């Protein structure tokens, strides 16, 4: 079987050529022009960033992608679906204001922003998952499925539940409607280590479903698993590492469901994927803050295969030296630190991210075997 091709360029620039232009060259080297986009609606799936977070991809990159789509005759729009948790992206109105405030407007990116699952996150369509073991019908935002062509523009970084966020997470979790996100999180309920809990209640502010309870007697937090949706938002909210992912089986279930949702999105239509390994924060861009990067900026990757793309980004990251004064460096400096010889596992030991890659390959999203082609 022929290896999937992944194209790569670093962040070095020549005089007179900025990074947006270099991104356009990367896309064309990878063959995006081979997709028929003439008068086709093209969904560009990205994360607009939570208000207060500055780690998300700059709008200039989105504009570069939209420009190439328009050059090829396509009709692009930027899209994402609403969230489960508190913040500024849980309905389309707040989500649009958040996108605009973070710089994603028609004037700056050259195309409109459309929230994929509608006003309240309920405008979805059930899409059969071919070969799905965990999900038979994925609930995907209708606007995303209505598009003729699908492009993912991914900020590759760490993630407190998935281990890392790349193409598969941006597609699978990101394109799920609110009901779809709930289905993916259904089995992965977090746990609290009471010996580490300070009772600061910060995690309570992050829970949309009253799933965290403060015990007035012990002055510790508890999780009401009947109310908990399993979104993992509380994990990143805790500064004391008191909240962690549940058992490994539940975490594996989460990763497999996410892979199957991604398959539902890309199956049966032209798709193309771009990942930027830059500002590699330890947590998701869903947070209203972004911690210091755990790894150096590496570069931009592009491929028709989202799985090969994720694998290439992981491999590139694992070759890097952790940055000082970061969550990863702090974890490695702790007494009794157990080295997993893996930057993402050292940052989030219970994430089980490899399960997602393995399952994605099993169900036919793509291949983990790739050829890396570098362009200057």
Describe these PLM feature segments.
Residues 2-61, 68, 72-80, 85-376:
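Extended, low-polarity segments enriched in aliphatic/aromatic residues
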């Amino acid at each position: 079987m022929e290896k999937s091709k992944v194209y790569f360029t670093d962040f070095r620039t020549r005089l007179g050529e900025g990074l947006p232009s270099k991104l356009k060259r990367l896309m064309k080297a990878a063959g995006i022009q081979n997709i028929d986009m003439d008068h086709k609606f093209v969904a560009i799936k990205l994360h607009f960033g939570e208000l207060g977070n500055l780690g998300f991809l700059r709008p200039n990159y989105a504009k570069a992608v939209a420009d190439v789509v328009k050059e090829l005759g396509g009709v692009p729009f930027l899209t994402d679906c609403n969230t489960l948790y508190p913040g500024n992206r849980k309905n389309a109105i707040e989500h649009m204001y958040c996108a605009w405030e973070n710089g994603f407007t028609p004037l700056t990116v050259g195309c409109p922003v459309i929230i994929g699952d509608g006003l309240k996150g309920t405008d979805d369509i059930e899409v059969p998952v071919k070969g799905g073991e965990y999900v038979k019908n994925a609930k995907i935002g209708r606007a995303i499925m209505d598009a003729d062509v699908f492009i993912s523009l991914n900020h590759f970084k760490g993630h407190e539940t998935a281990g890392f966020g790349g193409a598969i997470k941006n597609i699978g979790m990101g394109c799920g409607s609110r009901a779809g996100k709930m289905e993916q999180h259904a089995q992965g309920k977090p746990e609290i280590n009471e010996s580490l809990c300070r009772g600061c209640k910060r995690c309570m502010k992050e829970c949309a479903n009253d799933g965290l309870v403060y015990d007035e007697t012990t002055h510790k937090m508890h999780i009401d698993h009947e109310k908990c949706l399993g979104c993992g938002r509380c994990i990143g909210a805790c500064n004391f590492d008191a909240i962690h992912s549940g058992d490994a089986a539940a975490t594996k279930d989460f990763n497999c469901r996410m892979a199957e949702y991604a398959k539902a999105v890309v199956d049966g239509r032209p798709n193309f994927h771009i990942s930027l390994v830059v500002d590699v924060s330890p947590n998701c861009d869903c947070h209203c803050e972004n911690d210091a990067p755990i790894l150096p900026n590496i570069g931009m990757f592009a491929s028709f295969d989202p799985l090969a793309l994720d694998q290439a980004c992981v491999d590139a990251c694992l070759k890097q030296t952790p940055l000082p004064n970061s969550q990863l460096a702090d974890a490695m400096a702790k007494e009794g630190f157990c080295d997993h010889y893996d930057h993402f596992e050292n940052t989030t030991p219970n994430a089980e991210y490899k399960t997602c890659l393995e399952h994605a390959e099993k169900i036919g999203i793509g291949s983990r075997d790739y050829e890396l082609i570098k362009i200057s």
